[in-house]
């Protein structure tokens, strides 16, 4: 397990104008911590520290320690607002983590055995990913770093759905809980192969 930590300052100058000044003047990112039994807290983070943290995919599915004014808040990343053209973070939302209380977080999918999948190796198909992350609900101690999608037995024309995923103990998919069994990945006939067969006919 990697430790993820950020240092933050309490932000008292609030509002959109203040947020713009913060980003422009000192390379700081405005953020808010909310949830649990405490009031929301406005904070500011060094942009370079946040950018470095986000380089690690696992940061999105780990409990982070945010140090604010001598106290540590355990949080998960809830939402990031990015610049539409340049991609850097404009604002961050963090949700407090309370031991014994379920949280929701976005966890990346790791696709395995793609090259050796039946539909690829034996049938010449191509894999498409419909989604690359899922929202999970679990206790903080059960939060997985990622969820594997095993493509080994998938054939051409078959689709992997959320209900096909093997989840760690204590982890639920939010979409499934709401009755939405979304497609995750599929293997379809190669366009080149389909064109060749069409020409042969």
Swiss-Prot record:
<dbReference type="GO" id="GO:0008097">
    <property type="term" value="F:5S rRNA binding"/>
</dbReference>
<keyword id="KW-0694">RNA-binding</keyword>
<dbReference type="InterPro" id="IPR020930">
    <property type="entry name" value="Ribosomal_uL5_bac-type"/>
</dbReference>
<dbReference type="InterPro" id="IPR011035">
    <property type="entry name" value="Ribosomal_bL25/Gln-tRNA_synth"/>
</dbReference>
<dbReference type="InterPro" id="IPR037121">
    <property type="entry name" value="Ribosomal_bL25_C"/>
</dbReference>
<dbReference type="InterPro" id="IPR029751">
    <property type="entry name" value="Ribosomal_L25_dom"/>
</dbReference>
<dbReference type="InterPro" id="IPR020056">
    <property type="entry name" value="Rbsml_bL25/Gln-tRNA_synth_N"/>
</dbReference>
<keyword id="KW-0699">rRNA-binding</keyword>
<dbReference type="InterPro" id="IPR001021">
    <property type="entry name" value="Ribosomal_bL25_long"/>
</dbReference>
<dbReference type="GO" id="GO:0006412">
    <property type="term" value="P:translation"/>
</dbReference>
<dbReference type="InterPro" id="IPR020057">
    <property type="entry name" value="Ribosomal_bL25_b-dom"/>
</dbReference>
<dbReference type="Pfam" id="PF01386">
    <property type="entry name" value="Ribosomal_L25p"/>
</dbReference>
<dbReference type="GO" id="GO:0022625">
    <property type="term" value="C:cytosolic large ribosomal subunit"/>
</dbReference>
<dbReference type="Pfam" id="PF14693">
    <property type="entry name" value="Ribosomal_TL5_C"/>
</dbReference>
<comment type="function">
    <text>This is one of the proteins that binds to the 5S RNA in the ribosome where it forms part of the central protuberance.</text>
</comment>
<protein>
    <recommendedName>
        <fullName>Large ribosomal subunit protein bL25</fullName>
    </recommendedName>
</protein>
<keyword id="KW-0687">Ribonucleoprotein</keyword>
<dbReference type="GO" id="GO:0003735">
    <property type="term" value="F:structural constituent of ribosome"/>
</dbReference>
<comment type="subunit">
    <text>Part of the 50S ribosomal subunit; part of the 5S rRNA/L5/L18/L25 subcomplex. Contacts the 5S rRNA. Binds to the 5S rRNA independently of L5 and L18.</text>
</comment>
<comment type="similarity">
    <text>Belongs to the bacterial ribosomal protein bL25 family. CTC subfamily.</text>
</comment>
<keyword id="KW-0689">Ribosomal protein</keyword>
């Amino acid at each position: 397990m990697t430790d993820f930590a950020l240092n933050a300052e309490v932000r008292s100058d609030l509002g959109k104008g203040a947020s713009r000044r913060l980003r422009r003047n000192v390379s700081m990112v405005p953020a808010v911590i909310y949830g649990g039994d405490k009031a929301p807290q406005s904070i500011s983070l060094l942009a370079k520290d946040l950018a470095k943290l986000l380089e690690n995919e696992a940061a999105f599915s780990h409990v982070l320690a945010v140090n604010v004014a001598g106290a540590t808040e355990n949080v998960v990343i809830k939402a990031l607002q990015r610049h539409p053209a340049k991609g850097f973070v404009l604002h961050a939302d963090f949700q407090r983590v309370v031991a014994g209380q379920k949280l929701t977080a976005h966890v990346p999918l790791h696709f395995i055995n793609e090259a050796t999948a039946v539909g690829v190796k034996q049938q010449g198909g191509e894999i498409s990913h419909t989604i690359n992350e899922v929202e999970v609900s679990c206790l903080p101690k059960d939060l997985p770093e990622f969820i594997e999608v095993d493509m080994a037995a998938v054939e051409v024309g078959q689709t992997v759905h959320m209900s096909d995923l093997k989840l760690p103990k204590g982890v639920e998919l939010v979409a499934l809980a709401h009755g939405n069994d979304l497609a995750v990945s599929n293997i379809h006939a190669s366009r080149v192969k389909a064109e060749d067969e069409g020409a042969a006919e």
